[in-house]
């Protein structure tokens, strides 16, 4: 008797509108754009099938397992308001489909194969609900927000950073000099650019040594704890760990990784090393726009941010909001909360499709970086609050008097904004005036 072979409709097996989701399911919200003539139910079911147990036909080995236990299910579909032929398909995946503690495996399953699917014109993963049963299998950030503040002895204000420019071409000695000037001027951190690894003009070991010298000199002179994000990203995991080990031997507080170009496996390994050895971990999101910039295809950054919190990092770049559209402000603050808070309520206006309970996974500090300067300080302080890192590259090094005065300007502006806020002044309305007053100090 056997079974009926041949091509079959996915929706017969994988579209289950009556399904009640379980607390242990991983839930995904996909923005689906079906090809002309493909019904939305079939498109949603195809996504559920191809990202879980399905293939295009019935195979005899289906009889050797329980499909009901292991299959992904498309349990709800809704049209996207204001968009033609776009739908949000909600898919539930049983927990057994995923390896514990592996972001790599989670992404390989959920977004691995299905994005090239013929029945779909475009597909975007908008959000994931990670159940506590799964998030508990991850170490998460090496230290988290509170432990970082305790290590640095800095409370009640955002932290200040600066990316050293020009990002490529400086010798290690001159690079270290720029680091010293910025830290001496009042910044908490300086930063390797994401593409500073170990190039012919500046090998990593030389850079680490000169930056460590700059850190210790600035600490001795200011009495504050300082750091420089030493970029440990490398061509192999072994080389990356070797660089992190050297940073630890130098006694510096923080290293850095490009988590998308370096990959989740490397990132999780480095994160474990950092917790075991007391290093903070700064994460840069180089390559994110390749994945998240298209509105109807790819993966939204809020998913990449959640994945980073699971894989591990103490800081991550998350956009600046300033000067962008109001709607983007809400969306950005949505994933900033996903990085910092323990529990985030579902809120479609902010792009949050599911309530997310992180239980006790440490939080990540969002980093505002890119085209910002002192006149943005009131807005940044108001938008991001205390638990953030504000990073000014050109906004520090572009000061007409030099690097150290640029750093002083940023620190004075920040302290003025925090004081004004604590005194009850309205940063949004009086921001420029607060900065003008600070200039007279």
Curated annotation (Swiss-Prot):
Binds 1 Mg(2+) ion per subunit. The disulfide bond which can form in the large chain dimeric partners within the hexadecamer appears to be associated with oxidative stress and protein turnover. Mg(2+) binds at residues 191, 193-194. GO terms for cellular component: chloroplast. The modification N6-carboxylysine is found at residue 191. The lineage of its organism: Eukaryota, Viridiplantae, Streptophyta, Embryophyta, Tracheophyta. The record marks 324 as: Transition state stabilizer. Belongs to the RuBisCO large chain family. Type I subfamily. RuBisCO catalyzes two reactions: the carboxylation of D-ribulose 1,5-bisphosphate, the primary event in carbon dioxide fixation, as well as the oxidative fragmentation of the pentose substrate in the photorespiration process. Both reactions occur simultaneously and in competition at the same active site. This is Ribulose bisphosphate carboxylase large chain. Keywords: Calvin cycle, Carbon dioxide fixation, Chloroplast, Disulfide bond, Lyase, Magnesium, Metal-binding, Methylation, Monooxygenase, Oxidoreductase, Photorespiration, Photosynthesis, Plastid. Heterohexadecamer of 8 large chains and 8 small chains; disulfide-linked. The disulfide link is formed within the large subunit homodimers. The modification N6,N6,N6-trimethyllysine is found at residue 4. Substrate binds at residues 113, 163, 167, 285, 317, 369. The active site is at 165 (proton acceptor), 284 (proton acceptor). It is an enzyme of class 4 (lyase). CDD domains: RuBisCO_large_I. It catalyses: 2 (2R)-3-phosphoglycerate + 2 H(+) = D-ribulose 1,5-bisphosphate + CO2 + H2O; D-ribulose 1,5-bisphosphate + O2 = 2-phosphoglycolate + (2R)-3-phosphoglycerate + 2 H(+). It is found in: Plastid, Chloroplast. Its EC number is 4.1.1.39. The basic functional RuBisCO is composed of a large chain homodimer in a 'head-to-tail' conformation. In form I RuBisCO this homodimer is arranged in a barrel-like tetramer with the small subunits forming a tetrameric 'cap' on each end of the 'barrel'.
């Amino acid at each position: 008797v056997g079974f009926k072979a041949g091509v079959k409709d996915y929706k017969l097996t994988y579209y289950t509108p009556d399904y009640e989701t379980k607390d242990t399911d991983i839930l995904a919200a996909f923005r689906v754009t079906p090809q002309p003539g493909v019904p939305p139910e079939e498109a949603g079911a195809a996504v559920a099938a191809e990202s879980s147990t399905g293939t295009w036909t019935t195979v005899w080995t289906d009889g050797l397992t329980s499909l009901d236990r292991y299959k992904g299910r498309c349990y709800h579909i809704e049209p996207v308001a204001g968009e033609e032929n776009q739908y949000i398909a909600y898919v539930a995946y049983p927990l057994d489909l995923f390896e514990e503690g592996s972001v790599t495996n989670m992404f390989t399953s959920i977004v691995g194969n299905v994005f090239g699917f013929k029945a779909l014109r475009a597909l975007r993963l908008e959000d994931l609900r990670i159940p506590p049963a799964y998030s508990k299998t991850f170490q998460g950030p090496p230290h988290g927000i509170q432990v970082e503040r305790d290590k640095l002895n800095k409370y009640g204000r955002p932290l200040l950073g600066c990316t050293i420019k020009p990002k490529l071409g400086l010798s290690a000695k001159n690079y270290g000099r720029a680091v010293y000037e910025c830290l001496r001027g009042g910044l908490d951190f300086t930063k390797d650019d994401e593409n500073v690894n170990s190039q012919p003009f500046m090998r990593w070991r030389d850079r680490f040594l000169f930056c460590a010298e700059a850190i210790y000199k600035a600490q001795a002179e200011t009495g504050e704890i300082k750091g420089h994000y030493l970029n440990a990203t490398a061509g192999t995991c072994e080389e990356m760990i070797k660089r992190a080990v050297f940073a630890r031997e130098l006694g510096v507080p923080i290293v850095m990784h490009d988590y998308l170009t370096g990959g989740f496996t490397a990132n999780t390994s480095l994160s474990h090393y950092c917790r075991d050895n007391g290093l903070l971990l700064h994460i840069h999101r180089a390559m994110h726009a390749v994945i998240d910039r298209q509105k109807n295809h790819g993966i939204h950054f809020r998913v990449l941010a959640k994945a980073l919190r699971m894989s591990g990092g103490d800081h991550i770049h998350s956009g600046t909001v300033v000067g962008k559209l109001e709607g983007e402000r809400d969306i950005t603050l949505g994933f900033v909360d996903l990085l910092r808070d323990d529990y985030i309520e579902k809120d479609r206006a902010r792009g949050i499709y599911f309530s997310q309970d992180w239980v006790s996974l440490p939080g990540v500090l969002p980093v505002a970086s890119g085209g910002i300067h002192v006149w943005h300080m009131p807005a940044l302080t108001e938008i991001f609050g205390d638990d953030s890192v504000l990073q000014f590259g050109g906004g520090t090094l572009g000061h007409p008097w030099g690097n150290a005065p640029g750093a002083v300007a940023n620190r004075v502006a920040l302290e003025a904004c925090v004081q004004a806020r604590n005194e009850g002044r309205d940063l949004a309305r009086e921001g420029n005036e607060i900065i003008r007053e600070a200039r007279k100090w």
